[in-house]
A protein has these predicted regions:
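Short, solvent-exposed polar/charged micro-motifs at secondary-structure junctions
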Residues: 9-13, 75, 146-147
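C-terminal subregions of glycosyltransferases and related glycan-biosynthesis enzymes
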Residues: 85, 96-216
């Protein structure tokens, strides 16, 4: 099980944004495209689930692994997908924003190039587990991942990277536009606002959103 999360900054202040994920009827496609679990802090997992996905690398002599510890990023979605694709366990969320999730400038979430590389490595690693699934779903999931990274670049006020990633996800697949038109449109609008009007203008908008979120 898992819950939504309110986003906070380095100082612990609410940003006005939140992860409000899908809570029910979740399958591997939803996890691959949108990762409704959101972050590892939001999840509560039964021991039996970990027992079902345990593995031991050839060079590990002492203990079982559950997450792939060779990953520095994307280790959470790699684990969730192994659960979804190789076991009968179901994912279901609990209503409400029950955790806070810190977005750190210059942290892992901000390193969009490394995060994209880790995501692609995750896809390559798991492909043999369900080849037909990944062949069918990877293009759309990649577009969603690029859109997410575009939003991270926007939050970091990195106009060139935000614009580059926005072009990339639209070119990869238009399904995010059809499936989530509002979020897709606001992402594109923010990327081009940042590029055309500069970080100061967008920062003012983000500050207003943070103040509004703090009062809700």
């Amino acid at each position: 099980s898992f819950s939504g999360s309110a986003l906070i900054n380095d100082d612990g202040a609410f940003t006005g944004q939140a992860q409000r994920p899908r809570l029910r009827n979740i399958d591997a496609r939803h996890i691959f495209k949108r990762n409704p679990i959101g972050n590892g802090s939001a999840a509560v997992i039964r021991r039996e689930v970990f027992d079902a996905i345990a593995f031991r690398p050839d060079y590990e002599a002492h203990r079982e692994w559950y997450f792939d510890e060779t990953f520095r990023q994307s280790e959470d979605i790699e684990c969730w997908l192994r659960i979804a694709l190789s076991t009968d366990w179901e994912f279901e969320g609990v209503p409400g924003l029950l955790t806070n999730y810190r977005i750190s400038a210059g942290g892992l979430s901000s390193a969009t190039d490394r995060q994209l590389a880790a995501w692609e490595r995750m896809v390559g690693k798991l492909f043999s587990l369900a080849p037909e699934f990944f062949a069918s779903e990877a293009p759309v999931a990649r577009a969603y991942q690029l859109r997410y990274l575009s939003r991270r670049a926007i939050s970091d006020l990195d106009a060139p990277r935000a614009r580059e990633l926005s072009h990339a996800w639209v070119k990869t697949s238009l399904k995010p536009v059809r499936e989530e038109p509002l979020k897709s449109a606001t992402t594109l609008a923010a990327a081009y606002t940042l590029s055309l009007l500069g970080p100061r203008f967008l920062r003012q908008i983000m500050s207003l959103a943070a103040r509004k979120g703090a009062t809700q």
